[in-house]
Amino acid sequence: MEKMYHVGFDDTHGAKYVILPGDPGRVEKIAQFLDEPHFYCQHREYTTWLGKVDGETVMVMSTGMGGPSTAIGVEECYKTGVRTFIRIGTTGGIN
């Protein structure tokens, strides 16, 4: 498989789970709660780290701001084998 155009990685990561903060600055902080955290990839607004939870590979990837960049990140992660998406962070549009 070729690398995904926007997120910058292919399917060799082995993760089926991804935690999705919006801010790239939060990715490393979140990854430190995983076992064996390590930097994986950075392309555009998508900063990605990998780690383990109970022996399973878990990805932490920023999505940038807004729905369109989140949709692109989710779609490209799905194409690489990720099947569970956990969004964490704030919601700016609620009154």
Task: Report each predicted region and the residues it spans.
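Metabolite-binding pocket within alpha/beta catalytic cores that recognizes anionic/polar moieties
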Residues: 1-95
